[in-house]
Amino acid sequence: MAGRKLALKTIDWVSFVEVMPQNQKAIGNALKSWNETFHARLASLSEKPPAIDWAYYRANVAKPGLVDDFEKKYNALKIPVPEDKYTALVDQEEKEDVKSCAEFVSGSQLRIQEYEKQLEKMRNIIPFDQMTIDDLNEIFPETKLDKKKYPYWPHQPIENL
């Protein structure tokens, strides 16, 4: 059990050190050595504790019934393993993040296509020194003045000036 749990929770120390500030490298090295020591001690433990030889204790303990009482209490002792209520939440958030990332990527692909069309349009326009005002208004419609809606000069709303 210790070995299996140990394999699940590993730290990528190379990337950890890359993001660590220079003045905290000593603290990071101490953390890494402590972590390696802890993992080595954890890996040396067996999955189940060794069996207790109750007959040996019955033979060597002077007070009768004491070992039997300890054995009953030891066998009745059940240490609960804390329930893992956060892994499901993290998995759900991961699925939502994957979904939102996929939406963002698809939206980005659409924006890229639109920008590539605009870029191609910009590459194919007439040079500005050869362009007439009609060509400019055709290529960039936002520059066209609306003389019907705004009959007086500057032919656009005052807010846009």
From Swiss-Prot:
GO cellular component: mitochondrial inner membrane; mitochondrion; myelin sheath; proton-transporting ATP synthase complex
N-acetylalanine: modified positions: A2
Matches recorded under Pfam families: Mt_ATP-synt_D
Residues annotated as signal peptide: none
Modified positions (N6-succinyllysine) in chain numbering: K78, K85, K95, K144, K149
Modified residues (N6-acetyllysine): K32, K48, K63, K72, K78, K85, K95, K117, K144, K149
InterPro entries to which the protein is assigned, alphabetical: ATP_synth_F0_dsu_mt (IPR008689), ATP_synth_F0_dsu_sf_mt (IPR036228)
SUPFAM superfamilies: ATP synthase D chain-like
GO terms for MF: proton-transporting ATP synthase activity, rotational mechanism
GO biological-process terms attached to the record: proton motive force-driven mitochondrial ATP synthesis
First-listed, main subcellular location of the protein, grouped into a coarse class: mitochondrion
Similarity remark: Belongs to the ATPase d subunit family.
Function: Subunit d, of the mitochondrial membrane ATP synthase complex (F(1)F(0) ATP synthase or Complex V) that produces ATP from ADP in the presence of a proton gradient across the membrane which is generated by electron transport complexes of the respiratory chain. ATP synthase complex consist of a soluble F(1) head domain - the catalytic core - and a membrane F(1) domain - the membrane proton channel. These two domains are linked by a central stalk rotating inside the F(1) region and a stationary peripheral stalk.
Subunit structure, as described in the record: Component of the ATP synthase complex composed at least of ATP5F1A/subunit alpha, ATP5F1B/subunit beta, ATP5MC1/subunit c (homooctomer), MT-ATP6/subunit a, MT-ATP8/subunit 8, ATP5ME/subunit e, ATP5MF/subunit f, ATP5MG/subunit g, ATP5MK/subunit k, ATP5MJ/subunit j, ATP5F1C/subunit gamma, ATP5F1D/subunit delta, ATP5F1E/subunit epsilon, ATP5PF/subunit F6, ATP5PB/subunit b, ATP5PD/subunit d, ATP5PO/subunit OSCP.
Protein name in the entry: ATP synthase peripheral stalk subunit d, mitochondrial
Organism: Mus musculus
Gene (UniProt): Atp5pd
